[in-house]
């Protein structure tokens, strides 16, 4: 029996056979619909299972990659060696007390935005169309339309690389543009508390509807993508720079600069991760040559080179 099969058996004892997959194609777990196989993919159903899996992998010196629902992720075509831990809808419980929502990392951020509205709480309207999980959103300080997670997050329970639970509060998060203390230290968000404000439900709903409509009009939501590919360069808009380079609709293989929004790359149906990565590099080089601006990716790129 192969070493990875033996490891998979051990992980099955922790998380259950139904939650462990061998040689799982990562294209089934990313919004871009690309990516080679993960040696082992596990979806833990509790914090205790997550901790046990991390400790097991550490003891065996097996690399671990933790993901949410794969909406901000490019996995290379050769896939991911070691263990991929997917924290999604198995860890999605939440509570609401007065003006504070506390929720586990696997819940969708858009769902948390809806929960806020249902409870007459304002502050998370910006998040209504962000497709990722709460955990990923907190780790990278996700934001849109003038709002960011740093505006509402007051406390986060996270797990360090050793499987131990830690807590950060307020400024301890060290939020920056698309980054945080937790991300910099490879922490795994377990649950987060967000402090909101009492608001008018009709006004909250109206703003959410407006932002949703703007997204639908301006973003290629009907095609596989990973949202905004690039961080916003200081003083510029990434999409505008790409458009001004004449790259709207530019294709490499099955990857295309979106006709609808130049800040997005879409999978036209048969893209490989290599097509997307080659297109990213082409865009970066073109923008650098024309405008002298360095474009940094917002999307996570992982997997065997």
Curated annotation (Swiss-Prot):
EC number: 1.3.1.98
InterPro entries: FAD-bd_PCMH, FAD-bd_PCMH-like_sf, FAD-bd_PCMH_sub1, FAD-bd_PCMH_sub2, MurB, MurB_C, MurB_C_sf, Oxid_FAD_bind_N
Cofactor: FAD
Compartments where found: Cytoplasm
Positions of the catalytic residues: 178, 228, 298
Residue intervals of the FAD-binding PCMH-type domain: 34-199
Alphabetical keyword list: Cell cycle, Cell division, Cell shape, Cell wall biogenesis/degradation, Cytoplasm, FAD, Flavoprotein, NADP, Oxidoreductase, Peptidoglycan synthesis
Domain of life: Bacteria
Pfam families, alphabetized: FAD_binding_4 (PF01565), MurB_C (PF02873)
UniProt main location, coarse: cytoplasm
GO molecular function: FAD binding; UDP-N-acetylmuramate dehydrogenase activity
Any single biological process term in GO: peptidoglycan biosynthetic process
GO cellular component: cytosol
The protein's annotated pathway: Cell wall biogenesis; peptidoglycan biosynthesis
Catalytic activity reported: UDP-N-acetyl-alpha-D-muramate + NADP(+) = UDP-N-acetyl-3-O-(1-carboxyvinyl)-alpha-D-glucosamine + NADPH + H(+)
Xref: PANTHER family: UDP-N-ACETYLENOLPYRUVOYLGLUCOSAMINE REDUCTASE (PTHR21071:SF4)
Task of the protein: Cell wall formation.
HAMAP family on file: MurB
Family: Belongs to the MurB family.
Protein name: UDP-N-acetylenolpyruvoylglucosamine reductase
Taxonomic source organism: Acetivibrio thermocellus (strain ATCC 27405 / DSM 1237 / JCM 9322 / NBRC 103400 / NCIMB 10682 / NRRL B-4536 / VPI 7372) (Clostridium thermocellum)
């Amino acid at each position: 029996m192969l070493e990875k099969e033996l490891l998979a058996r051990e992980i099955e004892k922790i998380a259950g056979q139904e939650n462990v997959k061998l040689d799982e194609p990562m294209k089934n777990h990313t919004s871009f619909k690309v990516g080679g196989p993960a040696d082992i993919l596990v979806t833990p159903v509790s914090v205790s299972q997550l901790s046990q899996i991390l400790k097991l992998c550490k003891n065996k010196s097996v690399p671990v990659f933790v993901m949410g629902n794969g909406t901000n992720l490019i996995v290379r075509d050769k896939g991911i060696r070691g263990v991929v831990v997917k924290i999604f809808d198995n860890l999605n419980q939440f509570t609401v007390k007065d003006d504070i929502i506390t929720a586990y990392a696997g819940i969708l951020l858009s769902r948390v935005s809806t929960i806020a509205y249902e409870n007459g709480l304002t502050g998370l309207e910006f998040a209504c169309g962000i497709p990722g999980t709460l955990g990923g959103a907190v780790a990278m300080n996700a934001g849109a339309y003038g709002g960011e997670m740093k505006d509402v997050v007051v406390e986060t329970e996270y797990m360090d690389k050793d499987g131990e639970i830690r807590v950060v509060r307020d400024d301890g998060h060290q939020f920056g543009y698309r980054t945080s203390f937790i991300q910099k230290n490879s922490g795994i968000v377990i649950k987060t508390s967000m402090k909101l404000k009492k608001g008018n439900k009709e006004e909250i709903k109206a703003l959410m509807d407006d932002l949703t409509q703007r997204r639908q009009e301006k973003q290629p939501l009907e095609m596989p993508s990973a949202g905004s590919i690039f961080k916003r360069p200081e003083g510029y808009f990434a999409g505008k720079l790409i458009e001004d380079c004449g790259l709207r609709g530019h294709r490499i293989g099955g990857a295309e600069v979106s006709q609808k929004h130049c800040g997005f790359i879409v999978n036209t149906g048969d893209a490989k991760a290599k097509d997307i990565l080659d297109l990213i590099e082409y865009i970066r080089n073109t923008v650098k040559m024309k405008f002298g601006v360095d474009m940094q990716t917002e999307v996570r790129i992982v997997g065997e080179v």
